[in-house]
Design a protein with these regions (language model features):
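Metal-coordinating catalytic core of metallo-dependent amide/deamination hydrolases
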Residues: 81-83, 93-190, 196-197, 428, ...
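Divalent metal-coordination and catalytic microenvironments
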Residues: 1, 23, 34, 92, ...
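Glycine-enriched alpha-helix->loop->beta-strand junction motifs that scaffold or abut catalytic
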Residues: 154, 183-189, 205-214, 235-240
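Histidine-rich, glycine-flanked metal-binding segment
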Residues: 1-28, 44, 119-136
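His/Asp/Glu-enriched, well-ordered alpha-helical/loop segment
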Residues: 179-186, 226-311, 322-337, 450, ...
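Charged, amphipathic alpha-helical linkers/stalks
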Residues: 340-412
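A general structural motif
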Residues: 166-173, 191-199, 220-226, 247, ...
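Metal-associated gating/positioning segment near the N- to mid-region
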Residues: 21-90
Length: 493
């Protein structure tokens, strides 16, 4: 990428490049540092009660009925895995997201890998200047602080849930990082996700050891009624990134999470400027990943991950934080236009599919030279239609899975979704220092009725807020969410 002032001659290496007026404001692509994409076909969950730590809500019957169960069925039923992957990736694109946590896939041949699509994933970039981030640790590393420190020292970035909740048990997950010699199992590689239970002194420790954090305000407020003390984090000098978490208790994309961050910061009079909030999903996010030499800002020599918002605001930072999805007129990843209005997309070459965001016509370019064989040439429209059908027929699909003979299932070469919130027994997405292994969520799930008896038909979550007439109503019905968020958010879309 080369960057020159408006009206300046074209750079030497770009003499033959066409000049295209965007009629908008160009931003770095958004980097979502925390998102459980494999669940993002699901609509917002009406959180049944106020929780104080992460170990509680996963045991509620509604969680199995409305979240874990549906995605277990879709994630293991042939024909639906690729639909989920395509749909949630396009959900990112339509919200201006160019990088996210990846979608893990597991085959019945015993192979685990990450889906490689058009949106970058932080775990497997395939690029020397974009070092892979880790988002999971082994059981041993999750239960032994010394082993955890060794893992940190061998990682460029480790994105890990930390102190998710409001009670002392949640905070203990952070305090357990203190080693017997008085030092801390914290390095510049650690990016703690959520950090809701941390106190001001804890943020000082995090900053002194070079750690950073990922803030997910909407999900925190929906589940716990509180969010991280980002004012204390800012005062301590902790670098802060943003993550939309997942659609059952979070934003549809990082564009929405930026707006919630702005609302919360204003309500608390924290003093974050719009520029600082936007940096959480661009420049600071790239710093956390150790990608700042290649991404995070618009500078000569960096990769062209870009987002264009229609129109020119006198304050460009407010311009993005106040934009809806219909105003996103172009998204470019590594120099390749992936979604935008037809005028801009046609200027760059062919596209693969038309789509409508509310009343705004958009076209998508989902083609890849080395398309992931799991998804292939599946279109967004085909993915949407499959998921609508699958969610409407969950009990029937669950019964078919239940009745399928294990030998038949094993004979099919197939991939299934890894539902990382359920923590497979040999990996973890959060530390468990000092816990008895028997208390782990994956091991305390009590045997319940068969899924085909429990599940009910569900609606597919629309990919954008602009297309979801029920979104703000659902938010207003959330009992843990402060009124200032549910009342203030509609004006920013």
């Amino acid at each position: 990428m080369s960057v020159v002032p408006t009206g300046a001659p074209q750079p030497p290496d770009f003499q033959d490049a066409p000049v295209i007026g965007t009629r908008g404001t160009i931003y770095p692509g958004l980097i979502d540092l925390h998102n459980h994409l494999s669940y993002n076909a699901l609509a917002l969950w009406r959180v049944p009660e106020l929780y104080t730590n992460r170990d509680q809500w996963g045991r509620h019957l509604d969680y199995r009925k409305l979240i874990r169960g549906p995605m277990t069925v879709l994630g293991k039923t042939p024909g639906y895995v690729e639909a989920v992957v395509r749909y949630v990736e396009c959900k990112c694109l339509l919200g201006g997201v160019t990088t996210a946590q990846g979608i893990a896939l597991f085959s019945n041949q015993g192979i685990t890998r990450y889906y490689r699509g058009v949106v970058r994933n932080v775990e497997e970039t395939g690029e020397d200047d974009l070092p892979d981030a880790a988002t999971k640790i082994s059981d041993v590393e999750a239960e032994d602080a010394e082993k955890f420190l060794e893992r940190l020292q061998g990682s460029s970035c480790l994105l890990l849930h930390l102190s998710e909740g409001t009670d002392e048990r949640a905070r203990e997950h952070f305090l357990a990082l203190r080693l017997t010699n008085g030092t801390w199992a914290i390095t510049p590689s650690l990016a703690g996700i959520h950090c809701v239970a941390l106190e001001p002194a804890d943020y000082n420790v995090l900053a002194e050891n070079g750690g950073s954090m990922v803030w997910s305000p909407l999900s925190n407020l929906l589940l716990y009624g509180q969010t991280a003390d980002v004012e204390a984090a800012k005062k301590a000098g902790v670098r802060i990134g943003l993550g939309s978490d997942w659609s059952p208790s979070g934003s549809k994309s990082l564009l929405g999470e930026l707006k919630v961050a702005r609302i919360v910061a204003a309500e608390r009079d924290i003093g974050f400027s719009d520029r600082e909030i936007l940096a959480m999903s661009t420049r600071d996010a790239a710093e956390i990943l150790k990608w700042s030499d290649a991404l995070g800002s618009i500078e000569a020599g960096k990769r062209a991950d870009l987002l264009v918002v229609y129109g020119r605001s006198t304050d460009p930072y407010a311009g993005l934080l106040e934009a809806g999805e219909t105003q996103i007129s172009l998204v470019v990843i590594d120099g390749v236009p992936r979604v935008g209005n037809e005028r801009l997309m046609s200027s760059f070459g062919p596209w693969t599919e038309r789509w409508r965001v509310e009343s705004a016509e958009r076209v998508l370019n989902l083609s890849q030279e080395s398309a992931d064989p799991v998804v292939g040439a599946l279109t967004l429209r085909e993915a949407r239609d499959r998921l609508r059908d699958g969610l409407a027929n969950l009990p029937e699909l669950a019964r078919e899975l239940e009745q399928m003979a294990p030998a038949v299932r094993a004979a099919w070469p197939q991939w299934s979704l890894v539902l990382d919130h359920e923590e497979p027994l040999d990996t973890a997405i959060r530390p468990h220092f000092g816990e008895e292994s028997a208390t782990r969520l994956a091991e305390v799930m009590v045997a319940r009725q068969a899924l085909f008896e429990l599940l009910i038909p569900l609606d597919l979550d629309p990919p954008t807020v602009s297309d979801d007439r029920a979104f703000f109503r659902r938010l207003s019905e959330e009992t843990n969410l402060p009124d200032y968020v549910s009342e203030g958010l509609p004006a920013l879309f």
